Swiss-Prot record:
The gene is recR. It comes from Hyphomonas neptunium (strain ATCC 15444). NCBIfam families: recR (TIGR00615). GO terms for biological process: DNA recombination; DNA repair. This is Recombination protein RecR. Keywords: DNA damage, DNA recombination, DNA repair, Metal-binding, Zinc, Zinc-finger. A zinc finger (C4-type) spans 60-75. May play a role in DNA repair. It seems to be involved in an RecBC-independent recombinational process of DNA repair. It may act with RecF and RecO. It holds the Pfam family RecR_HhH.
Length: 201
């Protein structure tokens, strides 16, 4: 889009929208125009919601979740098992586990995964604060619920090595056949992981 066809305000809006995950310049233009066509019903309420979120939502100092209170609502929930910490890469992973409703322990969000390509090292993640939580005592088990990617597995091994010898069980989520999955539709890596994670019946 040329400078002549759009003013600096619109170009800035498009540029900012294009920084969102999964949106390129063309998609950003479509989103910007859609918002502008619905100025009163969408653009203004969205701008207000973004301003309010920026002012009120913060990262939980305990687990790394996002909320308007400190510590977050999940950390404040009574009846959860303080002795089990489930480590996830990012907040959507925490939300997914909460949505399932089967985990009743505590969480720790790393804020990503180790990545040599992206230049993300241990100091860029919440690994030190996880170790501090374990060192504070009372933790029996740390569950590594990290993504089954190369970076996720690298991070899992790194964290497991750091926690070795600290008197806690370090476990990871099972990998393999999803509920309702058919073997002939699975990739080779998933099948191999399922075979390695087999258990007695």
């Amino acid at each position: 889009m040329s400078q002549r066809s759009a003013g600096p305000e619109l170009l800035r809006l498009i540029d900012l929208i294009a920084k969102l995950p999964g949106l390129g310049p063309r998609s950003a233009r479509r989103v910007a125009l859609h918002l502008l066509k619905r100025n009163d019903t969408l653009l203004k309420p969205l701008a207000e919601a973004l301003a309010e979120a920026g002012a009120k939502i913060q990262k939980c100092a305990t687990c790394g979740n996002f909320d308007t209170v400190q510590p977050c609502a999940v950390c404040q929930m009574p009846g959860r098992d303080d002795g089990i910490i489930c480590v996830v890469e990012d907040v959507p992973d925490l939300w997914a586990l909460e949505r399932g409703g089967s985990f009743r322990g505590r969480y720790h969000v790393l804020g990503g995964a180790l990545s040599a390509i992206d230049g993300i090292g241990p100091e860029d993640l919440g690994i030190a604060s996880l170790v501090a939580r374990v060192d504070a005592g009372g933790v029996r088990e740390v569950i590594l619920a990290l993504n089954a990617t190369v970076d996720g597995q690298t991070t899992a091994h790194y964290v497991a090595d750091l926690l070795a010898g600290k008197g806690v069980d370090v476990t990871r989520l099972a990998h393999g056949v999803p509920v309702g999955g058919e073997l002939d539709h699975l990739d080779d890596g998933t099948l191999a992981a399922a075979l390695r994670s087999r258990r007695g019946v």
